[in-house]
Amino acid sequence: MAAAERITTVAELKVRIGQELRVSEWRVLTQHEVDVFGELSGENAWIHNDPERARNSAFGGTIAQGNLTLSVVPAMLAAAAGPEIDLGASYGLNYGFDRVRFITPIVVGQRMRARLTLLDVKDIAPGVIHIFWRRTVEVEGADKPAMVADSISRQYL
């Protein structure tokens, strides 16, 4: 097995702007996960947590909360193949999101996967950069993505 590609400098990372760097494996959200997330977050509307009632909805079943979808993406992408990015940062933080859209509902039991595209890298201060990512979640067989989220990671070099 070949060693994974490594990106170790900001210059190497900037060359990859506009490129998709990771695609996760397919994953299915279970009703149990949706129910637990609903209890933790308070997002427990019937469309998420009542399979019998949701069967008669336009979706034909319960749908995952958008915020649950957003929450599982980091783990999906961390497990995905792709270049290892090690800029030698002392630490990095989730700086936030510029835009999050939930476009197509994910019906419980549908397969979904995540894609990660590098949008930009900006120097913020000496030794501090922002990395701008697009996280896209697609549902198998759907014409439109389930979610598109533009996130920012702050790295302290």
Where are the language model's segments positioned?
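Hot-dog-fold acyl-thioester-processing enzymes
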Residues: 2-95
